[in-house]
Amino acid sequence: MRSVVLVALAAAIGNMLQGWDNATIAGAVIYIKKEFHLEKEPKIEGLIVAMSLIGATLITTFSGPVSDKVGRRSMLILSSVLYFLSSIVMFWSPNVYVLLFARLLDGFGIGLAVTLVPIYISETAPSEIRGLLNTFPQFCGSGGMFLSYCLVFGMSLQESPSWRLMLGVLSIPSIAYFVLAAFFLPESPRWLVSKGRMDEARQVLQRLRGREDVSGELALLVEGLGVGKDTSIEEYVIGPDNEENEGGNELPRKDQIKLYGPEDGQSWMAKPVKGQSSLALASRQGSMLPRGGSLMDPLVTLFGSIHENLPSENMNASSRSMLFPNMGSILGMMGRQESQWDPERNNEDSSDQDENLNSPLLSPQTTEPDDYHQRTVGTMHRRQSSLFMANVGETATATSIGGGWQLAWKYNDKVGADGKRVNGGLQRMYIHEETANNNTNNIPFSRRGSLLSFHPEGDGHDQVNGYVQAAALVSQASMMPGGKGETAMLPKEVKDGPGWRELKEPGVKRALMVGVGLQILQQFAGINGVMYYTPQILEETGVSSLLTNLGISAESASLLISALTTLLMLPCILVSMRSLMLSTIPILILSLVTLVIGSLVNLGGSINALISTASVTVYLSCFVMGFGAIPNILCSEIFPTSVRGLCITICALTFWICDIIVTYTLPVMLKSIGIAGVFGIYAIVCAVAWVFVYLKVPETKGMPLEVISEFFSVGAKQQDAAASFLSDG
């Protein structure tokens, strides 16, 4: 995993440059005003700062769709070039107009980085550490601000500080970013899969994961190309298989699925549960309308049912999965068969290599029962992990996809009137196990090593003898089986790119509502307005009175305080993202209210300065820990691969438009209603944001991206269907 961490860190340098720019312009604008005599021109001052935001907004309009066509890596390289060019022009700027043009170029680079870096990291990171890696952009942004504030503070101590040098230093880290983007960063494997470039995607995954066999994850990326096609949630009870036929081969009973373990002789039976569901996932999906007048979105409850049943964080790696030990290795045995993933062996024609997914996951199983009897159980255990449905003819193979999830496929074969089997299509299954904490049947179990030791109870086959419960999202597969079942073909329509009509999908619309809502509330909570003008705000609140005895000017003192503030901006996504926002937003409200009170009540210069400085510091630190980092992370996770670039563009446009409004209007608002009025408005917005997060924002931590999209789709469709049924009734 070391490689994927380094890749995420290198990509996040683009955000470090954004933070660097935010800090330098905040310090440089103090001296820009003096040189160009803008003290009485707050609109021009605001335009100098906001011009980069205008550029970011303009470039964001095209960044998502263009990145879907040319790739994420190419756009990051372009971002580094724009950063460098803008810094050179800012260093040369002879007048305000050239400076405004340079700020526009700078905004182009910022817009590309801020929009695409979270997407890039989400598309390259494994689900188990995706949330942690996605803190890198915010961490690097805060680090860039800290370093830049320190640099600007040092320059401000000179007799004649040069704002051109402050802005021009950006060219140095821009060169480093270009080198890393051009020669170190790989292309996003999900983007490569969406273009049918399977062999390149496999090589990238091998590099990022540090192992040769990545066939399971590669198949997951293919399945992520199609979301929400008649998805249903099914419930299973899984227990020991003690049935044997006369030949020693274990056969499943009717309507049961056999799961083979990693060792010879290990097998389980998965029995579909009919009637009222006892599983949290399946039962909560049963009623998608709010109950008892509750305003909480049922999707929040549906996602929550997954995280309530995840093993505790302090479990060791071998016990994180009750049903699938070692993160799913009971079913994911194909990972040991590196030789099975061989384009030359599976497909003589190498020209079709990019079109086909030559994967053991769709194994060449025969569909006739007699062929199955000819196989020995031991060979089946060693070569693949399979699921068989008796008397129906369904076969499937499965692999672990992280986060306690398994991806499985089954051929939905039907028996025709002539007694022959007819291919009913390929279905995928995202399987998730329940933990002991939610064992509603009170069935005893014990843990032996990393495997479960089952204790059958009762007589007869009609009684539930299993001790592990699981739920599965079942829908039509994106892959299309090849001639003998050895090859999974990519859907032809994938290469045509996303269309606007896909935004009408219920799951995509619901995800857009969450993403756009978070971006609006985040910006109108005032974070960027506060950051851009932190030196001036602290100067106006009287912070210089605390440092006059040190011989430091008011401008330098405010820059020093800003540097110390950014040092505290250490984001933390080691816990639930939803819980982190719900915990930190009240602190934001409290700090803003304290700032308002400190501005209205005269307690003396030193006391007022301390209150204002402490309030701003707490606000910035808590904001970046929660509400500042999470919206971009969440937006990079909740959309399907086929429309991710387009949806991120919509969210990013919302981000930049709101950012422009906040940044451009702040100088005017400070003069008209003062600091107390401005931060009073921000406090009200934060209160609204807390309500929105509580009612509408689900928890996605640790879930594969494809599963997240599937949940949004199935939840939104079923809720819409239920609402339509009630309205018609």
From Swiss-Prot:
SUPFAM superfamilies per the record? Answer: MFS general substrate transporter (SSF103473)
Name the tissues where it is expressed.
Weakly expressed.
Sorted keywords for this record are: Membrane, Phosphoprotein, Sugar transport, Transmembrane, Transmembrane helix, Transport, Vacuole
Catalysed reactions, semicolon-separated: D-glucose(out) + H(+)(in) = D-glucose(in) + H(+)(out); sucrose(out) + H(+)(in) = sucrose(in) + H(+)(out)
| The UniProt record lists the keyword rRNA processing | no
* Compositional bias per record (Polar residues), positions renumbered to this chain: 356-367
Supply the name of the protein: Monosaccharide-sensing protein 3
Source organism per entry reads Arabidopsis thaliana (Mouse-ear cress)
